[in-house]
Amino acid sequence: MRNLLRKLVSGVLAVSLAASLLPAAAFAAGNSAKETHITILGTSDMHANPWGFNYEDDKETTNNGMARLYTYIQQVRAEEPNVVLLDAGDDIQGTIMTDDIYNKKPESPHPVITAMNLMGYDAMTLGNHEFNWGISTMKKILGQANFPVLAANIKDASGNYVTGAGWTILERSGVKIAVIGVDTPDVPIWDGGKEGIEDCTYEAASTAVKQAIKEIGGQADLIVVSAHMGLYPEFDEEHGADSAQKILDDNPEVDVLQVAHTHSTVNQKQGNVVIGGVRSSGREIARFDLTLNANKKVIASSVEIVDMNGVTPSEELRSNPVIAEAHQATRAFISGGSGEDGEKGASLGSTTAKFQPKNEIDRLPEGKLRDTAVMDLINKVQLENSGADVSAAALFKDTSDLPK
């Protein structure tokens, strides 16, 4: 009888304990169910590299290109329900494909914008290189985009955003995400005098972001700034008009900051703000992960910079007719000369040695350390084309060379 009583008491206690735990478990499960996970993917400075190819050497690359980025983007979309894809500018300039062919015929389907449309971008921020061919050409090319192009700090002579938008609001699972785009206000330093450039006004980035946040008001749960500039000033040391750090200092409402322009990896957190930036030509992608609670407040956030080295390029992107044709046209332009008939031009000569010697110090090009044939060539071309008496140049691309 005593054993039976002990069993009955034990059973009652077990049932009572289980019952007491049920509400807590249900509460925890309910809270978890109300959390929302947002993944923001950020690219920038892709510099007209949809394929992942070095046209000067006629060789495939192994670690960059929009086709590799797209493979990774598709993987993330298959794993995460709420993905936002942003770009921070400098995309339509940078290779022979654009600079020598497609940007000279802006009414034609543009391979970079075609690729970005295929990849499903949600928004893009203007970069300074988008202005290289003047305002009219820029608008014709970017007008092909199926997504908004943002520049909250650049307005035309009529006081309108030069691209038609300074910010946009996206929605994922009920979470409203405001994306504010700002470009470096230093554009006139590089492109002043080109068509329409000096008709625009270029405002300090932090000031424009503050105004955009005021306009957005309570419409958004998250504030994302996509800035085509580095963290620290490039020219305006005193006021920080071209500093992304100044944006954060003046606008505590910002949750995510994407930086660009400097072609360098940035991966850090300041307080609760996640900050990311990537290297150029599609070498890396920034991944921001945020978790929001039932009140749509950020309770966890992180940033990761993902390298594209070894990633398989997307055949879907490469097989797109516009992109495939542009790739072949660029190779033909190099190998067949620039004549419309596609025939090779006259031989200008032959190289007897590399124009830039092998680096004596790893990652420090000889063209930046001493007199080299590659720098002599650049200066002679500048003298010939400008009619100047003196030419000074610095090596822009560390690997610039003419092989033996």
Q: Where do the model's predicted regions map?
A:
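Bacterial Sec-dependent N-terminal signal peptides
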Residues: 1-12
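C-terminal segment of classical bacterial N-terminal signal peptides
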Residues: 18-27
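Acidic, metal/ion-coordinating pockets
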Residues: 28-312, 369, 374-381
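Non-catalytic terminal accessory segments
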Residues: 27-35, 61-66, 77-80, 218, ...
